[in-house]
């Protein structure tokens, strides 16, 4: 029955916990079939109500200091490629690029400023941090962030190793770094790819308790290596919306168990990045060399440029850019 399919499709998109908090939604789940148009209308009405509550909920949590909100460039562009499409050659020198270079750093600046401005209008305060789209960074894009007054950015650990031209070192990974230039300075945090990807792609197939136990054991092994030194920052960064639909119960059991374990273990403390930077300022004498150009996908930009159809799209974009705003 088409009506049953419509209702179930929209019911399934409502989180199990949210369904459990609404008596009528719970009853519809129990009913299971022979839904009415009124049932469908109620489910769609709840969709609108839940969506309307998202921004206020985030705003309230940020005001309590429970979370930190960041922004990204406005339309999710790959900033380094807007600055200069040849930046793709830094990671992949042999990559076939479009014959005409796309170079509009002013567009990258606009995208960044619009993201910051929209965030401020929506949440009442300008964010201190920026997650560049797809963790895509370059020296030129980082300077734009400095000029915009951004305090910190984050990206993948692969960018750190390629910037420093070194192999993986936990003592290097688990501290913020500084980009210090004549035009300003910017803190950079690099995510632990292994720990982040365990949550993003692996633990969804595990029993929640076993997954949390494994994660905590990994944290314990790291903590044992740094007991005598200053506090370290282990950055867990992943797409916030993608993982949970693959977990049982939308990840509620895993997340509740994880936060309970972290809250009860005095060796660990959950912090926002700005909170850590305020308590443990970045060493002013420890500035990174020129930031490597790449993303959190294999440390390069091949996802967005370098294939025939993508190169053609960049040429069309360049033609449109030149025609509309020469």
Report each predicted region and the residues it spans:
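N-terminal catalytic cores of secreted or lumenal carbohydrate-active enzymes
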Residues: 1-92
